[in-house]
Amino acid sequence: MKNKLKKGSKGFTIAEFVVTIALMGTMMSVVLPSFDSITLNMQASQNKTNMDMIRQVFFGYFYDTHMKGVAHLPPSPTNEESLMDEEWANEIISADMIPTTPNELFSAGEIPTNANGHPFAYETWTDTTFLGSDGMKVDYYVRITDVDEDSPSFEVSFTSAI
């Protein structure tokens, strides 16, 4: 027996199906680029947050060592791009203090990276200003930069002083 649809039966015709697919395709072409933009903005924001967190933790370390009489920041990495890579992150910061590595300063046990898992560049330096008979003032500077070309925050950096 053949099943024949009755005139009043419910269902889609091919034309209705094609129109529905076309409308969904049009909507997706608008939504997907927006989603990609939102994702990139969120990754850039997370990268900036991670750079700021590193700065705050290193400044906390500086204040702790200052209270112990030997104020210093973790030294700049000596690799070509000054990256906070695993080798640098596992080196002891100062032999004069309790042996601590940069990784151990963070509660997660490792230095935060960018959204792509690439380490940030880090450098530190001092600037000494002589104040005449009042002595001198030493400013400690930190610069943290995202040097990953595939990162949405490429070349964004934070420079701060204590």
Task: Give the label of every model feature segment.
Residues Y141-I162:
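Low-complexity, S/T/G/P-rich flexible repeat/linker segments used as non-globular hinges
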Residues F12, F35, Y61-F62, F120-Y122:
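Aromatic side chains
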Residues M1-K6:
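N-terminal secretory signal peptides that target proteins for export/translocation
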Residues L40-G69:
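Membrane-proximal N-terminal amphipathic helix
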Residues G8-F35:
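N-terminal single-pass transmembrane signal-anchor helix
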Residues Y63-D146:
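Extracellular/periplasmic head regions of type IV pilus-like filament subunits
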